[in-house]
Curated annotation (Swiss-Prot):
Keyword Cell inner membrane: no
Composition bias, Acidic residues: 125-155
Name of the protein: PR domain zinc finger protein 10
Position of the Glycyl lysine isopeptide (Lys-Gly) (interchain with G-Cter in SUMO2) cross-link: K374
Keyword Transcription: yes
């Protein structure tokens, strides 16, 4: 509301006011406050008008009760206001504030009288206003003109000098001492509150009480639990305060400041921003309430629990014995009363019948036996314990719910206890016995305390078919699938088992005895009670005629309460409240309904009319219908669920609540529902479980090998200490980390092998709709189409995530291909599920394992190892140089290719599928920009080189540590050697490891061609000349010897590298092949032999492979012959032959007879792949 409008109603304007000025008298105090008295009957919201000292501006702000006028003091005693309509005389004293309606009232009468009676003056003024006959439109125009005049008259205040206590107003471009009088207050948005360091560092198991203060426990904290260290600034002893515990710290001279060398330093625990949560722990006043002890360890102070801290118990600390002497304090002495209380607190086995507590379960069992003598019968109630007497419509628990406790065997009829410690259920008398019994005896009112209390049953209301129950019977009421008390291999004796069984039964019985044992039964309605007083109170409701104050007018039946009478009056009304769930009939009494439902029994069971489910009890089928087939009218306000009963809704509302009022006294876990706490106590803290846990801890677990020694050798990954084999690398790594944490990864040779991962191409099935069968066409056309489709049409990705992003971006709404990880094996007659993934296996990738520097875990990539460190070792995640760079290795592809060739022979290609072959053939004419870079490195430890001079010589070992695979170039370009000559060293001692290279072929020129006889008599090895002992260290290193000079003349030799198409496992069992020697017992090797016309043989068997002159003989099964003019790999089936190896020109070439100086001959390499078992064997490298 505009302040001008408000003032017009309070003090109406007049022509006299506009022509004269007005003065406002006030007391030059801290401010003048006056209450405005309204003269009309119009209802207005509360306002307050704030006037500035010079009267130039004002503002209106809503107040809580009424309108206030604030007049700020100035130096003069009077303030001149330019607008008379806004002026009033204000008088302020210590007791009252008065306001005059106008300045003219003071001129025309006694000012003092007016000030003393402002209300009368206001009434007179109101009468004068009523006499004025003015038009409403004219008044509104005058108000608007007055408002415009007020705005035009407002002038901004002169700029004020800077004062930090002034509030800046950007609209006025000036500062004010408080709220801006023109534009009103600002709209503040406060900062979000942030917890202090002390409160934010509080552990999750603790909480700080907002009202009592101190630190309390949320759950049970065991003894010998350490908290800390204490954090806070260190000050001198004179600066300490008495509101917290004083902790002194002993520091070394290097940790002290210069000024504190001879002064004691104490923790100052009063500032929450500098200390941690331990500042809130209050000191203990005596030994009884102390549960923490303070001590110094190293340079820090810690708190340790000296007893079990129960839930909702406050932590209180005092000094340790030695630390108390250091801080000049005394430890708390233990009085005799405190000793008794402590002994009582150690009794953790309470009895719920008499509130006594015991130290051990055996003492509790002995005490429970005294209660068992009084209770010769133990029954249970139906449902969840809301028992209303014995079931009337069939025995048994509701189907689908497990038994709540162990029910015992009933072997006797008289209620006596059996010898094995079990209890017997008392036999219930039949209807005839109930009629003959006396009322007092049946109610149990006159029975002695320790006598057996017979519990009669209500007269049977079911048909004869339901009451056929034998009087003497034996029940075997054991729980379903009862587990054995002890494991199969246990040290418990039979007495221990019987004692554990008695403890279990007694503990379970006394949990439910209050709900199960109801000996006092009403003869009128059959309701049972645990106490006699409850039965007497109930009997008063069964009033008789003339004995009750309330009487029914229709039948003259008496009642004690109006509620009973109101319930009885329903019998005389036409409304029938009890309806049958099986038929349309309804009844006015519940007992009539129970008699009626007996006609719906079929084979002793009740059938649900909706779902045809069968139940042995009418109460069960009634609950089933109400729960599942009735209208759900009780709607949850938090979610969309609805219920048919209000109690179910209340139970459901606990899910939306954070309150957990039921606390487990053993472990401190909290629950929202009482039944969940009860189930938790039975499942987690029963004596049987505790006995199993204690026995499991005491017994050491014996090791049993899972497999026999014969199967142990068949595994790739195995632990030699435990003689166990594993199918995967990760299983071995986990086994070593758990069983052998001190063993290093380097000591296990299996874990140094590279990790083989499949390499796949992921295609987008939506980018090419015209797919065809490439293999149905001719060979060359299929190769060409395959290449064009792969690189020019199809969208190919190296990961499923990139293909998924492509489909979501370019094909929105399209169905994503199924994940390979979630595929299930195809059934009989079903298509292969891999066809729907649109992927193709292109080979395998061998990567070295990336080891975690903080544990024994291994990963195939650095990314996964970094994720592991961040998750499992967060304390090292932020430290620099904690992640080691893995070693680079070669890519073993299923599509091998010779990367480097000589310009005279052309490039040899080894392929495994047509698609890759087409890609390779057509890529020869492309530039290097379209080729896959081959810049990986391979680590090679040992390469035995077999050389021959005049006869067969022993292999000489040369170490090639690193061989770099160079990118493939055009056949017309010159090829540089990719063997690092500097890596061949002098004879040294090396440790043998796994090899990561499969094929190396080094060619060098021969000065003269050998004759046919020489070739026939020599093995597949280099030239026998001494100058061609090619790759000895002295020659390759370029020494000054004659052999070194001869090596310098062989600058035109080329190096050839090839990937083989199989994984590492395919090279097991390879052996060396020597001429005339079939029993060569050496390490597992791969031998590569080169035939003169460019044809070479890869041997993978231990049998010699002779080649006769003029033809290529059949080799052993598994041998592969690859010709220069034959780009595909053909498997030759043959049998092994004996004899010397003879090499003759093949049918594919005639160049053997005429060899020139430029002819080259290949040096034979034998690549060892033997894995050292313990990593300790050594191979000596000697010079040739």
């Amino acid at each position: 509301m505009d302040p001008k409008d408000e003032s017009a109603h309070v003090w109406p304007t007049s022509a006299d006011h506009e022509q004269s000025t007005a003065q406002v008298h006030f007391v030059p105090d801290a401010g003048t406050v006056a209450q405005i008295v309204y003269t009309d009957d119009q209802v207005r919201p509360p306002q307050q008008v704030v006037y500035t000292a010079d009267g130039a501006s004002y503002t209106s702000v809503d107040g809580p009760e009424h309108t206030l006028v604030y007049i700020h003091p100035v130096e003069a005693a009077q303030t001149l206001f330019t607008d008379p309509a806004q002026v009033a005389y204000v008088q302020q004293d210590a007791t009252a504030q008065q306001v005059l309606p106008s300045i003219e009232s003071v001129h025309g009468s006694d000012p003092l009288a007016t000030l003393q009676n402002p209300i009368a003056r206001l009434d007179a003024k109101e009468e004068e206003e009523e006499e004025e006959d003015e038009d409403e439109d004219t008044e509104e125009e005058e108000e608007e003109d007055a408002e415009d005049t007020d705005v035009d008259d407002w002038q901004p205040d002169p700029p004020r000098p800077f004062d930090p206590h002034d509030l800046w107003c950007e609209e006025c471009n000036n500062a004010h001492s408080s709220v801006c009088p023109k534009h009103g207050p600002l709209h503040p948005i406060p900062n979000r509150p942030v917890l202090t360091r002390a409160r934010a560092s509080l552990p999750l198991v603790l909480y700080i009480d907002r009202f009592l203060g101190g630190v309390f426990s949320k759950r049970r904290i065991p003894k010998r639990t350490q908290f800390g260290p204490v954090e806070g600034p260190l000050v001198r002893g004179s600066e300490l305060k008495d509101c917290y515990i004083h902790l002194k710290v002993s520091l070394d001279k290097g940790d002290r400041k210069d000024r504190d060398l001879h002064e004691d330093l104490w923790f100052e625990l009063s500032d929450e921003t500098l200390c941690n949560w331990m500042m809130f722990v209050r000191p203990a006043q005596n030994h009884l309430e102390q549960n923490l002890v303070a001590y110094q360890y190293g340079h820090h102070v810690y708190y340790t629990t000296i007893k079990n801290v129960e839930p909702k118990q406050e932590l209180k600390v005092w000094y340790a014995a030695s630390y108390a002497e250091f801080v000049n304090q005394k430890i708390h002495d233990i009085s005799e009363e405190e000793r008794k209380v402590l002994r009582e607190q150690e009794k953790n086995w309470p009895c719920y019948e008499c509130n006594r507590r015991f130290i051990s379960s055996e003492q509790l069992q002995q005490h429970l036996n005294s209660h068992d003598e009084k209770l010769d019968v133990f029954t249970r109630t139906r449902g969840r314990g809301r028992g209303r007497g014995k079931r009337r419509f069939g025995p048994g628990r509701r189907p689908g719910r497990p038994p709540k406790f162990i029910r015992l065997e009933i072997t006797s009829e008289n209620g006596e206890k059996s010898d094995d410690g079990t209890q017997d259920l008392l036999h219930f008398p039949t209807k005839e016995q109930f009629d003959e019994a006396e009322p007092a005896t049946l109610n149990g009112l006159d029975q002695p305390e320790q006598a057996s209390i017979p519990i009669p049953q209500l007269p049977q209301e079911t048909p004869p078919s339901l009451e056929q129950e034998p009087e003497t019977h034996t029940l075997h009421l054991q729980p379903q699938q009862e587990e054995s008390l002890v494991p199969t291999q246990t040290t418990l004796t039979a007495d221990d088992m019987r004692r554990a069984k008695r403890i279990r039964n007694a503990a379970l019985q006394h949990l439910f005895i209050r709900k199960s044992f109801r000996p006092f039964k009403c003869l009128q309605c059959g309701k049972a009670f645990r106490e006699k007083d409850k039965l007497d109170q109930h009997l008063r409701f069964h009033g008789r005629e003339g004995n009750c104050p309330l009487t029914c007018d229709l039948c003259n039946k008496g009642f004690i309460s109006s509620a009973s009478l109101e319930s009885h009056m329903k019998l005389h009304s036409d409304q029938k409240t009890y309806s049958c769930i099986f038929c349309p009939e309804s009844f006015d009494r519940l007992d009539l309904l129970k008699d009626h439902v007996a006609i719906h029994v079929n084979d002793g069971c009740f059938t649900c009319p909706t779902c045809k489910k069968r139940f042995p009890d009418f109460i069960q089928v009634k609950k089933h219908v109400r729960s599942f087939h009735s209208e759900k009218i009780y709607q949850c306000t938090e979610c969309d669920k609805a219920f048919c009963r209000p109690d179910k809704l209340r139970l459901h509302m606990l899910r939306h609540s954070d309150r957990k009022d039921f606390l487990c006294s053993t472990c401190g876990k909290q629950f929202k529902r009482k039944d969940k706490l009860r189930e938790h106590m039975q499942r987690m803290h029963n004596p049987e479980r505790e006995a199993k846990k204690a026995d499991r801890i005491s017994r050491s677990k014996t090791f049993k090998p899972r497999i026999t020694s014969t199967d142990y050798d068949s595994f790739t990954f195995k632990c030699r200490l435990c003689m166990m084999g594993f199918r995967r690398r990760g299983m071995l790594v986990n086994h070593l980390s758990k069983r052998h944490p001190d063993m290093k990864i380097e000591e296990v040779p299996e874990l140094t092998l590279p990790i083989i991962k499949p390499n796949r191409d992921y295609f987008c099935q939506y980018c090419d709709k015209n797919e065809m069968s490439y293999f149905a066409l001719s060979k060359k056309v299929a190769l060409y189409i395959a290449f064009m489709v792969k690189y020019l049409t199809l969208q190919v990705y190296k990961s499923a995530s990139k293909r998924k992003a492509h489909i979501l971006k370019n094909h929105p709404g399209a169905e994503l291909p199924p994940s390979i990880r979630k595929l299930r094996p195809a059934g009989p007659g079903e298509p292969d599920p891999m066809l729907s993934t649109h992927t193709q296996l292109t080979g395998t990738i061998a990567t070295p394992p990336v080891c975690c520097p903080h544990c024994s875990k291994q990963y195939s990539s650095k990314t996964k190892m970094v994720q592991h460190i961040r998750k499992k070792h967060p304390e090292y995640a932020q430290l620099p140089n904690t992640i080691h760079t893995p070693l680079t290795t070669a890519v073993i592809s299923a599509t091998p290719a010779v990367l480097t060739t000589d310009s005279a022979t052309g490039e040899t290609v080894v392929t495994t599928d047509l698609l890759t072959q087409a890609m390779t053939e057509l890529s020869q004419t492309l530039t290097t920009d379209y080729r896959t870079p081959q810049g990986d490195y391979q680590r090679i430890q040992y390469i035995p080189v077999s050389q021959s001079a005049s006869g067969l010589q022993q292999p000489q070992h040369i170490q090639l540590q690193v061989v770099q695979v160079a990118p493939a170039t055009s056949p017309h370009q010159s090829q540089q050697s990719t063997v690092d000559v500097g890596q061949l060293h002098d004879p040294q001692t090396y440790t043998q490891h796994a090899i990561q290279v499969q094929h190396i072929q080094v060619t060098e020129p021969a000065p003269a061609a050998p004759s046919a006889s020489q070739v026939a008599g020599q093995p597949l090895s280099p030239s026998a000349q001494q100058v061609q002992q090619g790759l000895s260290p002295s020659h390759i290193q370029g020494s000054s010897s004659t052999q070194g000079q001869a090596l310098q003349q062989q600058q035109n030799s080329s190096v050839q590298h090839t990937y083989l198409p199989n994984a590492w496992n395919s090279f097991r069992g390879y052996s060396a092949v020597s001429a005339g020697d079939t029993s060569h017992e050496s390490a597992s090797e791969i031998q590569m032999m080169t035939l003169p016309p460019g044809q070479f043989v890869i041997t993978d068997s231990g049998v010699a492979t002779p080649v006769t002159s003029g033809q290529v003989k059949a080799v052993t099964p598994g041998h592969y012959v690859l010709s220069e003019s034959q780009p595909e790999l053909e498997e030759k089936q043959a049998s092994a032959l004996s004899g010397a190896v003879q090499v003759q020109p093949s049918a594919h070439s005639d160049s053997l007879d005429s060899t020139g100086p430029s002819q080259q001959q290949t040096t034979q390499y034998i690549i060892t792949t033997t894995t050292n078992g313990n990593g300790g064997s050594e191979v000596h490298i000697t010079k040739p």
